[in-house]
């Protein structure tokens, strides 16, 4: 299951870090060598009032971002307003990724896709439609009814799932999430297959802090630029710092130092309970 794989991922990351420190090599070297000096990032626009979401775009652009992931997946009409208002604030050539995180039913996703289909031509932007529905079958149906570039995320949880989706021409990109694959070992295998298939990726994780971001950065650095579409620096969204030496973020890009292993040192004092759920 998902929690088991996430637990495996933490152990797997630690093993790669140990191997890097033992050999004196950065993890990106062990994963295939540095293919790019800096990794393109996107900025998440969290779901709230449409006008408030749109107001964030100039702020994030001033920080150097040109790729924006817009969280949708609620009421279709409200989501259409969110996407349209954000698109109106964007400049030609910028990337808008409408991410529903499985939140729509199939009929709702079809309504939204049809309502926003002309935005790329009207605004000169690059508009992507990400994981609109929960099941692979629903997503595939939506995919076959829209010309928008399509991203699969939650469905991409194994090598078999990737091969099936590629056979069905179900997507144009995938979100490659390290924790969902059980760590860097399996994620590298999926990454290499995507490169062989000519399939670009968002090199990612589901969430995390400095350590998860370092793993993302090393995998992304070792991925050819044309196949690493965008990534996220999760420690930028966190209020608790759990490690020193996190990747540096500047002008919408992330980079890691040429130090051995993942390049981060856990702050053991931070390993206390931050929050509790019941």
Please place each PLM-identified region on the residue numbering:
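Non-catalytic positions within long, well-ordered alpha-helices that form the structural scaffold/packing
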Residues: 58-61, 117, 121-122, 166-167, ...
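Acidic, glycine-rich loop-and-beta core segments that form the ion-binding/anion-interacting portion
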Residues: 94-150
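Active-site catalytic pocket residues across diverse enzymes, especially alpha/beta-hydrolases
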Residues: 90, 120, 223
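Active-site-adjacent beta->alpha loops and helix N-cap segments on the catalytic face
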Residues: 50-52, 74-90, 104-109, 132-143, ...
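A cross-family glycoside hydrolase active-site/sugar-binding cleft signature
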Residues: 42-44, 69-73, 97-101, 130-132, ...
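N-terminal capping/lid subdomain adjacent to the active-site entrance of alpha/beta enzymes
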Residues: 1-97, 101-110, 114-117, 241-278
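Active-site groove signature of glycoside hydrolases
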Residues: 66-75, 121-127, 174-175
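Shared catalytic-loop signature of beta/alpha-barrel
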Residues: 125-126, 134-151, 156-253, 257
């Amino acid at each position: 299951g998902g929690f088991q794989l996430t637990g495996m991922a933490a152990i797997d990351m630690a093993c790669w870090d140990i191997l890097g420190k033992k050999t004196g090599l950065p993890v990106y070297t062990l994963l295939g060598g540095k293919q790019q000096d800096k990794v393109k990032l996107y900025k998440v626009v969290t779901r709230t009032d449409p006008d408030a979401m749109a107001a964030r775009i100039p702020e994030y652009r001033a920080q150097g971002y040109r790729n924006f992931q817009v969280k949708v997946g609620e009421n279709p009409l409200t989501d259409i307003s969110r996407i349209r208002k954000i698109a109106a604030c964007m400049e030609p050539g910028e990337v808008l990724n409408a991410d529903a995180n499985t939140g729509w039913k199939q009929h709702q996703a079809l309504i939204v896709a049809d309502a926003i289909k002309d935005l790329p031509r009207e605004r000169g932007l690059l508009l992507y439609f990400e994981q609109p529905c929960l099941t692979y079958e629903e997503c595939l149906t939506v995919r076959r009814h829209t010309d928008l570039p399509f991203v699969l995320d939650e469905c991409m949880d194994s090598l078999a799932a990737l091969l099936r989706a590629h056979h069905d021409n179900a997507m144009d990109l995938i979100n490659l999430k390290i924790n969902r694959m059980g760590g860097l070992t399996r994620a590298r295998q999926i990454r290499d297959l995507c490169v062989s298939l000519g399939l670009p990726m968002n090199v990612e994780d589901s969430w995390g802090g400095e350590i998860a971001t370092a793993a993302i950065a090393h995998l992304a650095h070792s991925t050819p630029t044309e196949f690493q579409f965008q990534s996220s620096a999760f420690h930028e969204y966190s209020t608790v710092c759990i490690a020193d030496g996190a990747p540096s973020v500047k002008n919408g890009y992330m980079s890691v130092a040429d130090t051995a292993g993942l390049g981060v040192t856990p702050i053991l004092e931070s390993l206390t309970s931050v929050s509790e759920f019941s």
